[in-house]
């Protein structure tokens, strides 16, 4: 597999074409951003940690019957993925109140949400990824009603699989965001799953082990990511 020209560069990853029209190379960089890209720093080893973490999680999800774009690791910072048409919508599940939900609704951080909430956000950096609803998705043609229903179904299934996985490592899956795309007409999981895109707390101490350590200047960001992985049995 030959990596060719860069197709896209996001906040923390770059996507490259390959000599195979059905596959892309996803490069995890050390860039770490917050507040819609207003703050960006380089954190040593982060690209490697997130790449290996993502590969591990994608493997667990695939084993649970959830289709993903992940194919295999290529290097410490690169993965081979299926080429697909991304749906410009983020799906967010919240098991406990945190982040923007607390700010929007004035609820207590850590409040258990039963049942978990499901939210949609438009992927648009210029607009700050605004919250949208299911009618918007269908009316603007970002996804069909059937595709959105499948995205919602898969997101809740991901939640059940990963809640149990992190619980085994004495961690709480507070919330997470996932993105989907279409591959040969099928809705499959795309992008990544890492502590960059979810909230994880230690079950006993409620210590934050995710990107909030960067947002809130708590320090030891990559070390916390590695700790999460180690609790799941990963080695970096």
UniProtKB/Swiss-Prot annotation:
Pathway: Purine metabolism; IMP biosynthesis via de novo pathway; 5-amino-1-(5-phospho-D-ribosyl)imidazole-4-carboxamide from 5-amino-1-(5-phospho-D-ribosyl)imidazole-4-carboxylate: step 1/2. One of its GO terms (cellular component) is cytosol. It comes from the Bacteria. It catalyses: 5-amino-1-(5-phospho-D-ribosyl)imidazole-4-carboxylate + L-aspartate + ATP = (2S)-2-[5-amino-1-(5-phospho-beta-D-ribosyl)imidazole-4-carboxamido]succinate + ADP + phosphate + 2 H(+). Its EC number is 6.3.2.6. Disulfide bonds: none annotated. One of its GO terms (molecular function) is ATP binding. Pfam families: SAICAR_synt. GO terms for biological process: 'de novo' IMP biosynthetic process; cobalamin biosynthetic process. Keywords: ATP-binding, Ligase, Nucleotide-binding, Purine biosynthesis. InterPro entries: SAICAR_synt/ADE2_N, SAICAR_synt_PurC, SAICAR_synth, SAICAR_synthetase, SAICAR_synthetase_CS. It is an enzyme of class 6 (ligase). Belongs to the SAICAR synthetase family. NCBIfam families: purC. This is Phosphoribosylaminoimidazole-succinocarboxamide synthase. It comes from Cellvibrio japonicus (strain Ueda107).
């Amino acid at each position: 597999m030959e990596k060719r020209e860069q197709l896209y560069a996001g906040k923390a990853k770059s996507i490259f074409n390959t000599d195979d029209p059905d596959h892309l190379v996803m490069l995890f960089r050390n860039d770490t951003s917050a507040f819609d890209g207003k703050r960006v720093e380089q954190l040593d080893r982060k690209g490697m940690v997130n790449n290996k973490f993502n590969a591990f999680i994608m493997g667990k999800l695939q084993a649970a019957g959830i289709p993903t774009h992940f194919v295999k690791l290529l290097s410490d910072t690169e993965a081979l993925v299926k080429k697909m048409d991304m749906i410009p919508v983020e799906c967010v599940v919240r098991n406990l109140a945190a982040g923007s939900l607390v700010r929007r609704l004035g609820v207590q951080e850590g409040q258990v949400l039963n049942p978990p909430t499901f939210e949609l956000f438009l992927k648009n950096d210029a607009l700050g990824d605004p919250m949208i609803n299911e009618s918007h998705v269908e009316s603007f043609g970002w996804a069909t009603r059937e595709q959105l229903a499948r995205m919602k179904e898969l997101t809740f299934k991901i939640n059940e699989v990963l809640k149990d996985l992190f619980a085994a490592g004495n961690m709480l899956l507070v919330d997470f965001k996932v993105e989907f795309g279409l591959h040969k007409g099928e809705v499959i999981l795309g992008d990544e799953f890492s502590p960059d895109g979810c909230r994880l707390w230690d079950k006993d101490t409620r210590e934050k082990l995710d990107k909030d350590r960067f947002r809130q200047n708590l320090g030891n960001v990559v070390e916390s990511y590695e700790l999460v992985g180690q609790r799941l049995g990963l080695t970096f």
